[in-house]
């Protein structure tokens, strides 16, 4: 199912994501974190953090998140080697979301391009506004 979504040009947005998170979380609270390349300012991914993930990120200077699907700490790069060195953390005005400024060590997304390379961002498609279809960029 994930490949159908990740490699498709069909627009299939998951508007129920927050509801799934709410239903899946038992003992933890999370806030969203946008992750941006500190040098290029390119947005790399959107994830969630809880206190444990934030503390781990600060202590180890590696972008770390809370996996809302697995309900566990997600150290980005632990299995792939695609670590994100944490340069700075910013907090929004209402203190209910964060911005991680990072320096990627390799790729970022868990998906790969047609040549088998890890993508540099999870935002590798755009919506054709006329056709409401996705286009790889």
Where on the chain are the PLM-derived regions?
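C-terminal binding/interaction regions
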Residues: 2-30, 37-44, 49-137
């Amino acid at each position: 199912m994930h490949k159908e979504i990740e490699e498709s040009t069909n627009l299939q947005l998951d508007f129920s994501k927050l509801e799934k998170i709410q239903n899946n979380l038992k003992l933890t609270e999370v806030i969203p974190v946008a992750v941006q390349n500190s040098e290029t300012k390119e947005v790399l991914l959107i994830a969630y953090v809880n206190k444990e993930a934030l503390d781990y990120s600060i202590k180890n200077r590696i972008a770390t998140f809370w996996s809302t699907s697995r309900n566990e700490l997600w150290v980005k790069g632990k299995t792939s080697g695609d670590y994100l060195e944490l340069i700075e953390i910013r907090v929004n005005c209402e203190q209910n979301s964060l911005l991680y400024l990072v320096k990627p060590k390799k790729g970022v997304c868990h998906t790969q391009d047609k040549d088998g390379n890890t993508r540099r961002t999870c935002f590798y498609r755009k919506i054709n506004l006329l056709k409401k279809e996705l286009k790889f960029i």
